[in-house]
């Protein structure tokens, strides 16, 4: 096989093969077609910039024993403090004017652009692959932002062939020069095999002063040519490439200054002083730095290619012209695939043109896809700390132990702020990704489901694997605990996937759907094979169902509420016997001011907190999980399970109305026991996202009169409707805009998206172009869709980025910058709704 795949995929595909061989209706050729699909998936997704936290960092997917790790860094070495502006990890502190993908598809490649005013650099990185996915090339191209400003672009590449030495020799070694500044390496990986790695200049002017006989200030410190240093760095420390580089160059500077204390060096020799050299006479090792320093007073800039070719490959990339051709083909192919999935017709909005709208959507989707990463390592878990639910104080997780290693293939909310997997976010990411590449969304979903613990059914709310991922997380959030949940959005996404497959085939339980198989001849032009061929999804559902059942049961058990506290109250109200006692829930782990498990951290809850508090959103998410499990059981023909889930779903829906609907407030609310009178059920009503969640998750019956009341709330400009989207909390609420102000007014795309989607479900006429006066729902749908998408576009046009959330006052971007996680759902709104 090409790679050592994870246990998950080995098991899945072996199971599929057994099922096919056992079926009388499927011949060997069909089995071969399944194997071709597997091969296509593994090859097309093997290589990509899967180090989400880096501006550009490569590693292969599901290769963890001996991966080749690669990264790009840069700085202005003409500045004495240039090392402080060395770019490596994506971080808001760098204050780049722009960074991100303009066009990107992990199966194909793309174009990433960096505008770095401090370093006077307009840097473009192209990433392309051979058609079979085995080989790749990275083209690094830079131009000065201001050629009149004296500066350099000192670009630092690093490569590490992890996995140790082979027969006492380095597993990645330089084997020659094809030119004065071109280098060739031979590498070997236990999983990838043998390969060549080349670095070749196309054009550019290395920094030098023609008046000087030499630019060398110490042996090896010469900025007028490519500098190379090889050394041994432990695999677990490779992610510290920036720190190691800064340390080695700083030591070199001190050595130079100590040896020539009285000599005053000209300013244009500073780039040589800031060039890496082998000061300590390291023996060659698995790790390599390559530093190229270009003169940015030359308008034409510079360009060089980094190329990886597997030995024995049939599709090697060997010339500059081939790289150029692959770049052209890749960008054209991605654009064609994008246009096939999304349509941007003229509409009654203020976006200037279809092409501008399309460019915004393509860039936004590209940055969501560009955040996809492969993570491998240990996770910190505290299984000892006990939760005292009566205190409602922040619980310190001080008994963490490393567990693992684990692996996760996932997208991330933000490369600069949150470059790791978030359970709450990922389901929303998949709702967008599946519209472009259904099979890719499935690969991510399957990786997450593999994180379900076999014994307990728990999934951590954040997956933080290894030191590189952990370095970007505040210490107080690094440790996970099995008592804490998060909204189960992954099942929301899986339910949508199954719905798509059912729609495409018709009767999912008929025998005919098994006959629709993968077509190997068209695979390389299709990324929705699983959507069109539900047999694969069914076999996967069979494999994963026991784990999903454990996860479902874990969530219900861990978040169960205390209904007995309400017995006398509800008996007095005459509804105790109608209540379904097993379907009441609250979020475990809330404090006086925050409820992190709910995902809506500071959204106002009952004050003071009480152990008897019941949360309407926790119940609603159980409804979503149950509906998804019912659908899976239907697909698998598990009739008794399906009936049981249908019963639980009905009980959830009834409890939403019986327990959480306030007739006085006309909305869904949390409930608690009145702190001043323990014989009264208190409706804790804070109109906002929690109030509309049963609607957004399609849990209200279609014939319910409550639908119109929820629509009225969403339409009210005095409450949560605005020119920029639905506010997270009503303007009239006492907590609006107060304190941290995270979910107390700011506009979030994920809930807005669910509300728009729910309106399409409850009111099909909202998308129909029919004459006559529009209904309240249609007016809301049309105005919300336009307001939301126009504001996100406007902020992107002005600032260059999507944001985590948006101001309820004037719509400007707030929270994390360059947040193309669930905010990227704007692409669906523009191109699909």
UniProtKB/Swiss-Prot annotation:
It is a single-pass type II membrane protein. This is Mannosyl-oligosaccharide glucosidase. Glycans are attached at residues 42, 122, 135, 787. The keyword Hydrolase applies. Belongs to the glycosyl hydrolase 63 family. Its EC number is 3.2.1.106. The gene is CWH41. Substrate binds at residues 42, 122, 143. Pathway: Glycan metabolism; N-glycan degradation. PANTHER family: MANNOSYL-OLIGOSACCHARIDE GLUCOSIDASE (PTHR10412:SF11). Disruption phenotype: Displays phenotypes characteristic of cell wall defects such as hypersensitivity to calcofluor white and resistance to K1 killer toxin, and results in a 50% reduction of cell wall beta-1,6-glucan level. Abolishes glucosidase I activity. Residues 1-10 are cytoplasmic. It comes from Saccharomyces cerevisiae (strain ATCC 204508 / S288c).
